[in-house]
């Protein structure tokens, strides 16, 4: 029987590993970090060299990368991703937690993916004001895979797509857990929290009305009924 000797690298096959960008988005408490950890561990089991990068200003769990339920994984802290570029080039798989905090997230991920790395990013897609968080959404058109997770509303237990701040801080970057934030649904997002002041100064969680007179018009609808009840009692 004659055997055919095939070349080790077939013609037309890539000469190096193809890189890719995977993005995991969602509100707080939606399991983004847990999903990032799960994906990285799959690559570790397959004997790939992995590096996880965490935001250095988040010191709640020391130097480890951690989920809210305290599952941990070794991580390299950084404030700018370019500061850990050399370490990243030595890994096949790069996981980035809290990607919304890194100002150079888009450039870093594109460079690493073009260098053949698998880059997995977990990040908030929106701020507590439901606005784009930093430049993270600019990563979406560059990514091969994008997933948006939902949480459970911590006020009514329905599906939650938003993050609601409980305190009065105005800064976008305020690190905290359930003591500072709730994952909420659309209805509960607009409900006033007991720690939030009512009035015109609290614009973060206020719905936008179609016409300026809508709010007063609603109150007028109930005026005749209130007058009738008052007359009947007299």
From Swiss-Prot:
A GO term for molecular function: ATP binding
Source organism superkingdom: Eukaryota
Binding site for Zn(2+): 153, 156, 185, 188
PTM comment, free text: Phosphorylated on Ser-13 in mitosis. Phosphorylation of Ser-13 by CDK1 during mitosis reduces homotetramerization and catalytic efficiency when DNA replication is complete and intracellular TK1 is still present at a high level. Polyubiquitinated. Postmitosis, ubiquitination leads to proteasomal degradation. The KEN box sequence located at the C-terminal region targets for degradation by the anaphase promoting complex (APC/C) activated and rate-limited by FZR1.
EC id: 2.7.1.21
Top class in the EC scheme: transferase
Localization in the cell: Cytoplasm
Primary location class: cytoplasm
Motif placement: KEN box: 203-205
GO biological process, one term: thymidine biosynthetic process
One matching Pfam family: TK
Family annotation (InterPro entries): P-loop_NTPase (IPR027417), Thymidine_kinase (IPR001267), Thymidine_kinase_CS (IPR020633)
Reaction(s) the record says it catalyses: thymidine + ATP = dTMP + ADP + H(+)
Miscellaneous: Two forms have been identified in animal cells, one in cytosol and one in mitochondria. Activity of the cytosolic enzyme is high in proliferating cells and peaks during the S-phase of the cell cycle; it is very low in resting cells.
PANTHER family per record: THYMIDINE KINASE, THYMIDINE KINASE, CYTOSOLIC
Family stated for the protein in its record: Belongs to the thymidine kinase family.
Protein known as: Thymidine kinase, cytosolic
Organism: Cricetulus griseus (Chinese hamster)
UniProt gene name: TK1
